[in-house]
Every structure is written in C-alpha cells, then in structure tokens.
C-alpha cells in the first residue's frame, strides 16, 4: 500500500505528459492542415469574379447612384451604428465611392491587390457603420469577403502583381486561405436553413407574392400558385439551404449541389431585387471543388487560348508560408520547417473567428434593444434570409411643444423608411426630428410621438410601438428589451389563413377594390381619413370597437359592418378587453368605371386567329423582348452617365472649395513689409 502511494505522483505526472503530447499532436495536425500547400488558381478565380461584381455593387446597391439624394440634404436624418463616427459630405462621398471602384478593379485584376483589398474593406465597412438602413445579409457577407481578401493570398495566380513579381506568380497558398471562404459559404447556407425552421416559413406565410412569377411558369402546368409558394418556394427553399453546404462539400454530391445552386440563384436573381447577391453566390460555388480545377478546365481549350493563362504546376516548396510533408533537410527551398508563434496565432485567430460566426446569429439575447417582434438583432449577421416580409408602413408623426402645448402633425419621408422597423433607428429618428423642430420651427421643448403600423408575414397590420410614448425621452439600450415596443398580436395569427377567403369573397380581382386588415390593442384609437373618391366599409372580425364618424358613434361587435362617409376622417377605438381585429373594404368608384369600360372594349374587339396572326403575335413577342433588353441597356447607360456627371461635379466642387479656402487664407495673412 505504501509503495503504491509512493509511486502515485510519478504515474500522474506521466499521465499529464501523455495528455500534453496528445494535445500537442492535435494542434500539430491542425496546423499541418491549415498550412497544407494548395494550388492558387481557384482562389484566383474567386478574386477576379468578386472584384468584377463589386464594381456594380458599389455603383448601384451601395448607393453611388443616389449619393446626392441620400447624403446631399444636411437636414436628413442619419442612422449610424456609432453616433460619433463622422459622416462625409456628398461631394467627398463621391470620392470615397470612386476610390472603392478603383479598389474593386485592383482586386479584379490583382494590381496592388493587398492595398486594394484593405481599402475596399475600410470603405465598405465605413458605409455599413454610418447607415444601418442599408444593412442586409449580403452587405454583411460582402464585408466579410473584403476582410478575407485582405488577409489571404488571392493574387498568386492570374494577377498583374504576379506578372510584375515572378516570386509570387503561381506559387502555393496555405489551405486556410480557401477554407476560410468555404466555411463562410457553408455557414450562410446552413444557418439560412436553420433560421427558416419557424412557423411562419413552414406554413408558407413568409413570401406569398412570388408564386405567380414567370420563373415558375413550367410548374404551373402541374401546381397552383399557392402550391408553388408552399411546396417549391418555402419547403424547397428550406431543404435547399439545409443541405446545399453538405452537397457542395462532398465530392460525390458536388455536381448535384452545383446544379441546384445555379438554378436556385438564377431564380433568386429574377424574383427578388437583391442586387448582385445571387451572382456572388454563383461565383463562389466552385470554391468547394479541387483547388486546381481552373487549370484542368483551361487545359481543354485550344493552344491559342491557353497561352493567356499560367498553367504550370507550382514548383516544389514554392511558398514560404506553406508546410510540406515531404520536407528534405538537404533542400534549401523556402517553406515552413517548424511552426512558430505566428502560425499558432493565425490558428487562434481563425478559431476565434469560427466561434464568433457560430455565436453571432444566436446572440440576440444579449443585444435585446435591436430586436423587433420575432426578427432578432440588427438585420445582417443573423442570416434571416427572406424569413420576414413587411408591409409598407403607415406612419403618423405628432410633435408637441411641451412649453406651450402646440401640436404639429405630419408624415415621414417615403424615400427611406427602413428605420421604421427597428427600435434603435426609431429612437434615432425621434431625436433627429426633435433637433430639426428646434432649429427650423423654434420649438423649445419638442416631444415626438410616432404611430407606426406594420404587418409582418401576412398578419394584421398593427402598431409597432406605443404611440403614447415620447420617443425623445423614451429609454433605449442595446442591452435591454425596448419597453415601448408593442407586442406582436400572435393570438390573432389564426386569422391569416382566413384572409385569402375574405379577399376572394369581398374583393373582385381588379385594381379598383382593396382590403386592409387591422388589429389594435384595448383602449387605443386609430384615425383613418376616407378621401372623397373612395367608398369604404368597415367589418369587425374579433373584439368590439367604437367608430366615431361625422359626429355619430357606432358600437360594433364581430360580424357587424358599417358604411363610412367619404371625405371624412373617422376614428376607431377598441372597447373590448382583448385586442380587436377588423378590416376595410375600399373601392375607387372612378377607377372601377374606367376598368369596366376597358373590359367592355376588349370584349367587343374582334380578333383574327389566322396563321398570319400567329406570325404577327410571334414577331410582336420578339419585338417586346428585344425592346425590354434595349430599355434595360439604356437604363444602365443612363445610370452610369448620371454617376459620372455627379462625380465630376463633386470633384469640381471640392477643387473650388479648396481654392476658395486658399484665397481666403491669402487675403487674411499679414503682408511682409
């Protein structure tokens, strides 16, 4: 017994040493994997495509085309993430965007690649930080890509840098350069699928208006529009996102993954207005293939075309930042012979990044101040792709001067309404509006009340925030739940399935009749004007309401309907103890008459269905398609002409401003006697 206890410490020490050697062996294996040499051509192709696409992204979706509209009004409200971050003037914004285009071109052709990548990353993230209204998933993803290119060696193949410096031309790159992109793309697909595992998406309520799109025309031979929306768009989109990353990862399923990815992203590019995102995802499908796949493809070209590409295999031990397993001590080539602290630091940074990306999409229990109903956090890093669709907001603004009780009523600028969905930006808008009222209208103590009505995923349109709370003095913190955010009326969600039937029953399928569904909280009142050209009926679905119109008060219970007077503003107050739901049937009599006359003209028109008419129909269709293509090209030419003129004017303004400043300084400088 004594002898056993005496030897126990040495046995424990041996166990610790074995465990240490085991951990060291695991770390060594990970480092060998990360620094394994691979061919640079796949990442080089990704660089070329990304740089090319970013040129169009900067000019259009990043907002260069409407700089003067967005940044040219000094009174416009801004929504930066960091309030102390300076915002450039419109003229200097043109210079920033122009430099970002130059950086994107530099990335595309691989010229001063590192500097171009870093500058594009700085410019892209600056635009993100100064304008939360522009945040979305692909903006965030492109920002991550700019960082990736800043730290990887994507200019080692088919780049101007490689032509100018043969030492980096067609040399190996460490595997982590490509694995970083592979991890992020896999995560985008998979987490987009995970976020779709909610009741709204599974019941087909998130995206309901695109089932009739022309891309689904072949499917309409077998399925109805509703079935396409439910089974193809929602179920198909969910399954695709969950499995696409796995399909691309394994060699045996990769062809299927690429085929599905091409079809999916091409459809998205036609259905949704989401900029270059579908094309960027198309451009990254290949990164899961073998790293030297571009060279294998090019080898199949004729010799006259091959000469424009560098097809040689990278020489043995060609990169000093790669680890070669077949190391020969007698060889003097440049390579990693033993991992150092810098290599281990890179591994730690990559591990930290992976952990962060896995945590951020589910971190909204920390940043509760950015949450809105079931949309969690600042839209972008959550990968909630198409999960929530919002109706066009109805906004009423009331400003009260607390010093004298004067009221000012107005509406919001309809150009930029993204702020109306998120409490953090609503708070910023209220503060901005209060500041404007102080300076422009000399209001001493402004209080701002916002009545914002929105519908999410086909539910009733309801209040987003409490209209009785002064936004200026209301508390808001990124770490706490927003107290003045009204709850989602989830108990009324079951009515969503009955809304299509109600629309079909009460509304003829034309543009002259519409139905608007509303839900409100007990004790709250809504003011609704009915223009003279419209006829409106109100029907209660659930709860009790009191309607005050033309000095008459009507108390309505479920299934009761009232005809509302035109050219009068009425109020609807919820008098029941639980929330009430009701809808308006609105008809434009003038538009209805015009549409009826047009239908009658079509009915009386005699069509000739001879073979000549079919040829005429075909030629008309060809002219229509050709005309649309020409109009599209014209619009793009006009956009870039507009950008060029505005940028030239901005440069002139800056030069003139500098000249005026210099002349002013010269005029006030003391003369030398």
Where do the model's predicted regions map?
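Alpha-helical membrane-anchoring segments
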Residues: 1-673
């Amino acid at each position: 017994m004594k002898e056993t206890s005496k030897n126990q410490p040495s046995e424990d020490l041996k166990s610790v040493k074995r465990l240490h050697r085991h951990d060291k062996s695991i770390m060594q294996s990970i480092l060998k994997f990360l620094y394994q040499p691979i061919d640079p051509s796949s990442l080089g192709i990704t660089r070329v495509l990304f740089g090319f696409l970013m040129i169009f992204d900067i000019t259009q979706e990043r907002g260069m085309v409407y700089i003067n509209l967005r940044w040219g009004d000094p009174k416009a409200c801004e929504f930066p993430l960091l309030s102390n971050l300076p915002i450039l003037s419109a003229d200097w914004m043109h210079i920033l965007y122009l430099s970002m285009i130059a950086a994107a071109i530099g990335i595309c052709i691989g010229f001063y690649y590192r500097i171009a990548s870093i500058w594009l990353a700085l410019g892209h993230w600056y635009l993100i930080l100064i304008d939360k209204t522009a945040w979305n998933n692909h903006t965030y993803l492109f920002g991550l890509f700019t960082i990736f290119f800043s730290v990887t060696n994507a200019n080692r193949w088919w780049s101007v840098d490689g032509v100018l410096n043969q030492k980096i031309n067609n040399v190996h790159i460490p595997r982590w350069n490509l694995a970083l992109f592979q991890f992020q793309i896999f995560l985008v697909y998979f987490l987009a699928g995970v976020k779709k595992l909610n009741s709204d998406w599974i019941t087909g309520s998130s995206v309901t208006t695109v089932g009739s799109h022309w891309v689904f025309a072949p499917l309409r031979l077998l399925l109805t529009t509703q079935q396409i929306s439910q089974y193809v768009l929602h179920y198909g989109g969910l399954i695709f996102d969950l499995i696409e990353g796995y399909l691309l990862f394994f060699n045996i399923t990769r062809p299927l993954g690429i085929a599905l990815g091409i079809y999916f992203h091409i459809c998205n590019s036609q259905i949704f207005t989401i900029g270059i995102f579908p094309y960027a995802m198309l451009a990254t499908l290949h990164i899961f293939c073998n790293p030297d796949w571009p060279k294998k493809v090019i080898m199949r070209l004729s010799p006259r075309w091959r000469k424009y590409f560098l097809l040689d295999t990278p020489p043995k031990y060609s990169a000093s930042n790669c680890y070669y397993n077949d190391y020969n001590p007698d060889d003097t080539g440049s390579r990693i012979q033993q991992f150092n602290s810098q290599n281990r630091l890179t591994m730690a940074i990559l591990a930290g990044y992976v952990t962060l990306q896995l945590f951020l999409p589910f971190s909204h229990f920390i940043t509760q101040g950015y949450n809105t109903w079931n949309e969690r956090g600042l839209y972008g890093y959550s990968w909630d792709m198409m999960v929530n669709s919002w109706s066009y907001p109805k906004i009423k603004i009331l400003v009260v001067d607390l010093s004298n009780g004067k009221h000012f009523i107005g509406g919001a600028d309809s150009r930029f309404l993204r702020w109306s969905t998120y409490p953090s930006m609503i708070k910023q808008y209220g503060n901005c509006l209060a500041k404007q009222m102080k300076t422009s209208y000399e209001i001493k103590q402004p209080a701002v009340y916002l009545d914002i009505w929105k519908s999410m995923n086909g539910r009733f349109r309801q209040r987003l925030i409490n209209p009785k709370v002064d936004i200026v003095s209301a508390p808001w913190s990124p770490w706490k739940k927003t107290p003045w955010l009204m709850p989602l009326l989830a108990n009324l969600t079951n009515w969503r399935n009955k809304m299509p039937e109600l629309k079909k029953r009460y509304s003829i399928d034309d543009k002259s009749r519409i139905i608007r569904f509303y839900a409100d909280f007990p004790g709250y009142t809504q003011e609704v004007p009915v223009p003279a050209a419209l006829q409106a009926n109100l029907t209660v679905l659930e709860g009790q309401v009191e309607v005050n119109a033309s000095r008459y008060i009507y108390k309505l219970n479920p299934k009761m309907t009232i005809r509302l007077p035109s050219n009068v503003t009425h109020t609807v107050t919820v008098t029941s103890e639980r929330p009430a739901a009701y809808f308006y049937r609105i008809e434009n009599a003038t538009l209805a008459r015009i549409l009826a006359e047009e239908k009658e003209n079509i009915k009386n028109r005699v069509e000739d269905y001879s073979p000549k008419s079919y040829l005429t129909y075909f030629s008309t269709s060809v002219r229509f398609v050709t005309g649309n293509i020409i109009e599209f090209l014209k619009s793009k030419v006009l956009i870039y002409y507009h950008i060029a003129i505005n940028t030239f004017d901005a440069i002139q303004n800056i030069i003139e401003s500098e000249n005026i400043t210099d002349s002013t300084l010269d005029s006030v400088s003391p003369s030398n006697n």
